[in-house]
């Protein structure tokens, strides 16, 4: 099949590999992007990307918290100019506020009443599109709650209160001091913003992701030419490293890299004054998995794609 310049560009962004390596990988895998990333990794050309997905959309992430709950919403716009508009920012805040009164799914939020209005969130967004003159999309919504404890929040590089390009929620169950729990929770949320973990615990990592990593590590190890029993130990070691990199509680804590997040939680229990448990987290980065149409492309990539 013919490999396009856009495919080469996308694979370069996903893998960090060179142009010609990306073109070869796409040719070997018939243009299958995920398979091409794996092909590059097996060759030792590309590193694992912990969460596939390109960030290409404009808009804002909004966060609102109240009592024992907090929500994240993502609303996309066509341009950053509109995202910096006060009207658009108010819409994101109000949609997040509306989400607090629901179970958090996008359907439930769309059907709920927009704050201070008799119209639904969905109808209000449609009206705003006509007013602003640019399309906007309510892309996703998520809510975390605790029975007793806190849901800490963090917005990275906020453009206004509760609004930015990346947002995180962290649920901590504890009967202890809520102020201390919230302070630690914010540190964990900042850590999550920086490290983008796949899961809370090793048991939470998707089995297909584990099998994929094992297959790639096995292929890499076999290229060493070592005996099968040595290869098995090499794979076990690389899988341990994989879990340390992608499991939140096993990651080195950004605030103190000498200890894990789990160990930091144990330390935090001293100031919290009671046992504490991180039960869930959610991380929204603006435009994850969304692509914009590219109207222009680098000449050397186009030349490479042509052959």
Swiss-Prot record:
Signal peptide per UniProt: none
Specify one Pfam family. Answer: EF_TS
Matching InterPro entries: EF-Ts_dimer_sf, Transl_elong_EFTs/EF1B, Transl_elong_EFTs/EF1B_dimer, Transl_elong_Ts_CS, UBA-like_sf
Q: What is this protein called?
A: Elongation factor Ts
| Protein location | Cytoplasm
GO molecular function list? translation elongation factor activity
| Highest taxon listed in the record's lineage | Bacteria
State the GO CC annotations: cytoplasm
Q: Where is this region: Involved in Mg(2+) ion dislocation from EF-Tu?
A: 79-82
Q: Which UniProt keywords apply?
A: Cytoplasm, Elongation factor, Protein biosynthesis
Q: Which organism is it from?
A: Bartonella henselae (strain ATCC 49882 / DSM 28221 / CCUG 30454 / Houston 1)
Please describe what this protein does: Associates with the EF-Tu.GDP complex and induces the exchange of GDP to GTP. It remains bound to the aminoacyl-tRNA.EF-Tu.GTP complex up to the GTP hydrolysis stage on the ribosome.
Q: Which family does it belong to?
A: Belongs to the EF-Ts family.
- Please give the chief subcellular localization of this protein: cytoplasm
In terms of NCBIfam families, this protein maps to: tsf
């Amino acid at each position: 099949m013919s490999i396009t310049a856009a495919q080469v560009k996308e694979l370069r962004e996903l893998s960090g590999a060179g142009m010609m390596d990306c073109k070869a990988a796409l040719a070997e895998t018939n243009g299958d992007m995920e398979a091409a990333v794996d092909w590059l990794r097996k060759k030792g050309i590309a590193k694992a990307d912990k969460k596939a997905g390109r960030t290409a959309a404009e808009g804002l992430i909004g966060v609102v918290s109240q009592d024992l709950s907090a929500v994240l919403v993502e609303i996309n716009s066509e341009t950053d100019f509109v995202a910096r508009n006060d009207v658009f920012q108010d819409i994101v805040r109000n949609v997040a506020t509306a989400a607090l009164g629901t179970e958090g799914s996008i359907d439930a939020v769309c059907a709920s009443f927009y704050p201070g209005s008799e119209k639904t969130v969905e109808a209000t967004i449609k009206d705003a599109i006509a007013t602003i003159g640019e399309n906007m999309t309510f892309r996703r919504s998520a809510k975390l709650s605790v029975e007793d404890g806190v849901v800490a929040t963090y917005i990275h590089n906020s453009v206004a209160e509760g609004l930015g390009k990346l947002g995180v929620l962290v649920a901590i169950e504890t009967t202890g001091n809520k102020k201390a729990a919230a302070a630690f929770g914010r540190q964990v949320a900042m850590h999550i913003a920086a490290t983008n973990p796949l899961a809370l615990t090793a048991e939470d990592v998707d089995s297909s992701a584990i099998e994929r990593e094992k297959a790639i590590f096995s292929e890499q190890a076999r290229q060493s030419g070592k005996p099968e029993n040595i290869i098995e130990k090499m794979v076990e070691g690389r899988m341990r490293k994989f879990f340390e990199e992608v499991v939140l509680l096993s990651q080195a804590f950004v605030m103190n890299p000498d200890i894990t997040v789990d160990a930091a939680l144990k330390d935090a229990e001293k100031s919290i004054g009671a046992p504490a448990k991180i039960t869930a987290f959610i991380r929204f980065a603006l435009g994850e998995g969304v692509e914009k149409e590219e109207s222009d492309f680098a000449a050397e990539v186009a030349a490479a794609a042509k052959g």
